[in-house]
């Protein structure tokens, strides 16, 4: 499942944006968003999702359970 950013909790510090290996995080209208189609949960790059690890606000970068889990290409 890709991650999403809870806009109401995001401080727009941008700590997450440069860490995303898939360039899935961008700023739109003053808020940071994760493009679900690009998010791989950092599988194959890191042991844990970098957006969640870098975010200074707990539970702001979270799994978007409404979308299917990322599957690495075979």
Swiss-Prot record:
GO terms for cellular component: cytoplasm. Binds 2 [4Fe-4S] clusters. [4Fe-4S] cluster 1 binds at residues 10, 13, 16, 55. Keywords: 4Fe-4S, Electron transport, Iron, Iron-sulfur, Metal-binding, Nitrogen fixation, Repeat, Transport. The keyword DNA-binding does not apply. SUPFAM superfamilies: 4Fe-4S ferredoxins. [4Fe-4S] cluster 2 binds at residues 20, 39, 51. Its cofactor is [4Fe-4S] cluster. InterPro entries: 4Fe4S_Fe-S-bd (IPR017896), 4Fe4S_Fe_S_CS (IPR017900). This is Ferredoxin-like protein in nif region. The lineage of its organism: Bacteria, Pseudomonadati, Pseudomonadota, Alphaproteobacteria, Hyphomicrobiales.
